[in-house]
Amino acid sequence: QCIVFCAFNDPLYQLAETFKDHRGTNFKGQEWHGSAVITGKVSKKKRYKIIDDFMAGKTGLLCIGTVAGGLGIDLPIARFAYFLDLPWSPADFEQCTGRILRLGQERDCQFIKLLAAGTIDQRMEEIIQTKATIFQEAIGDMGALERVTAKEADQMRRSIVTQVIQSYIRDAAAA
């Protein structure tokens, strides 16, 4: 079973539509069918039903909005998790991966970030990794990222965007 994270809703709905009729078998030998989406638009009641179906092995692909699925969801049954775009901070990435890496998890999960060479996403990834390394060296506890306030997370996002833009301006000036 697979989870796809994305900050934007349209790609999630398009992906779910593409795979709505697909069938397969999970590692328990249970047949799964189709896909589901969790975004901020999905009601709490429907969200719980989608999660229950995924955890029961009834759904093969779960498309999740990074913000909507970052907290309060446990999905340890997933075997693969793809990031169509990058979370804005190491804390956001830790929140997403933390939904899958739980006690009671039955299998390993592979996390795949879809990055194209020479894109803004690649540069953002470099900056995010640098910040995570600095944070880990200074604080030593990546779990502390989960305790970052909304204001601090917003400041981190703004800082990353500023650094990416400045990097592109420097690269353009040097060329």
Please state what every model-predicted region is:
Residues 1, 34, 108-110:
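Residues at the starts of beta-strands that form the adenosine-phosphate
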Residues 3-5, 13-14, 20, 29-69:
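Conserved helicase ATPase core of P-loop NTP-dependent helicases/translocases
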Residues 12-16, 47-52, 60-85, 89-108:
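SF2 helicase motor core recognition
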Residues 18-26, 99:
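Alpha-helical structural signal in soluble globular domains
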Residues 36, 82, 112-114:
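Hydrophobic/aromatic beta-strand patches that form the interior of the parallel beta-sheet core
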Residues 39-42, 85, 115:
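Residues at the C-termini of beta-strands that transition into short coil/loop
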Residues 88-175:
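A conserved SF2-helicase RecA2
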